[in-house]
Amino acid sequence: MTWLNKQVQKRPDHPAFYFQDESWTFLEVQQEVSHWVATYQQVLAPEEKRVALFSKNSKELYFSILALWELGKELLFLNTHLTLAELTFQLKDAQVKTIIGAPETQALLEEISFVDVQPMIKKQHSLSHQEFQQPSDLESVASIMYTSGTTGQPKGVLQRFKNHLASARGTQENMGITAEDCWLCAVPLFHISGLSIVVRQLVLGCSIRLYDKFDEQQVTQDLQEGRGTVISVVATMLQQLLSVYPEAGYSASFKGMLLGGGPIAPDKLAQCEEKGIPVIQSYGMTETCSQVVALKFEDAALKIGSAGQPLKDMQIKIVDELGQEQPEKQVGEILLKGPNVVSGYLNQRQPEKWTADGWFKTGDMGYLDAQSYLYLVSRLSELIISGGENIYPTEVEQVLQAITGIKAAAVVGEPDAQWGAVPVAYVISDQEITLAQIQDQCSRKLAKYKRPKRIYFCHSFPQTASGKIAKHRFMTEEREAFLIR
């Protein structure tokens, strides 16, 4: 029996899903899903186990996810900001034959000749629910999301139903989520932060209010009027909500915000505390199916700056470069182990990320205090997190260095008031090339959020003793010595 069916049996008339001015109970969700199942049965072969989805947040995407899971399909979630080249790589790497896209994406998708493109449009017919019900198998792959990693080569993360289930249970225990909660989802469903909210709904029986895009005015109005008890945010969203925070505050039913997706300025958290907004900082990634370390509501004010403690059944340790466990307050690499953590990447990429005894090497640096609260020092050392999106410098550097006229490139993150951080590029040219030419190539090969916001020409790069680029010097006044003026 699927998670949706269980909720229908328990609470058929309980509110389940809100989108714009529409609402559905769990029973009504199941009835709507039956139409979508019938639609996709007409275009997908039973033996086709993997399907790609390409859409911004919509009710159609939500129902498509549930319908395709009912049909036992593995779902490849594609970021709608990807360029044609990036889409092509992921579709080929995942060996997907069919991509289901929102109507507004059809023109772009028609340029991809090696897949069958199907519109995300429901057809008006239905089947008996028992005819298409699939037995749930927690070992099955539920979703695939690509993450670039430090190599710049995107890797498909294989997220199984058991990983999602453990994540939902851990969140329930940490945050006290019940069927009476309504989780506001203004983050993309193609990100783990968004999809995990759908899983929590199915597992815990809470309702979801989905937004097609984040609008701080609309979210604020909904929180004022009691239309949501919890919301997931990244730093950029939190800043925007603070800018329009009403004098009267939010509804008494509001529990708090779950903050993820990168660093936030301590003064913003202090503002939240002053206004009485509970904010739970958390730590997680695509490979852990959302947060695996988080604060509790009661600890939020006492442990500002900490990502919290491990959630239910999760283990964490800090090790040095030799793999030896570090004592408290000693910085080292963060290793994770537990049911939330995936067991591998698609096509067996980078198996060395997992130790022989099952620990996942995050590549992130941090330390634990005496009470085992985690403090992050850096994320993948060079990872740039901009508005909740991960940008891996290596990926951007590879695009820049493929441009005729660029001999070398280095990309770093610079602090930004709006986005938290933005990518900035330093290049060495070996022939005449203009800034406009570089920007044109970046716009063709990189999603908008990955494109360098500033590009500087250099005569040379600072180097370490071993000959590597000393990128940290680009983040100080020392960079002036290497720029062409």
Swiss-Prot record:
Naturally occurring in which organism (per UniProt): Enterococcus faecalis (strain ATCC 700802 / V583)
CDD domains: OSB_CoA_lg
Gene3D superfamilies, sorted: 3.30.300.30, N-terminal domain of ligase-like
Enzyme Commission numbers on file: 6.2.1.26
Name of the protein: 2-succinylbenzoate--CoA ligase
Role of this protein: Converts 2-succinylbenzoate (OSB) to 2-succinylbenzoyl-CoA (OSB-CoA).
GO biological process terms, semicolon-separated: fatty acid metabolic process; menaquinone biosynthetic process
Keyword field contains Transmembrane helix: no
Pathway: Quinol/quinone metabolism; 1,4-dihydroxy-2-naphthoate biosynthesis; 1,4-dihydroxy-2-naphthoate from chorismate: step 5/7; Quinol/quinone metabolism; menaquinone biosynthesis
Pfam families: AMP-binding, AMP-binding_C
Highest taxon in the source lineage: Bacteria
Reaction equation(s) it catalyzes: 2-succinylbenzoate + ATP + CoA = 2-succinylbenzoyl-CoA + AMP + diphosphate
GO molecular function: ATP binding; medium-chain fatty acid-CoA ligase activity; o-succinylbenzoate-CoA ligase activity
Signal peptide (residue range): none
PANTHER family: ACYL-COA SYNTHETASE, MEDIUM-CHAIN ACYL-COA LIGASE ACSF2, MITOCHONDRIAL
Entry keywords, A to Z: ATP-binding, Ligase, Menaquinone biosynthesis, Nucleotide-binding
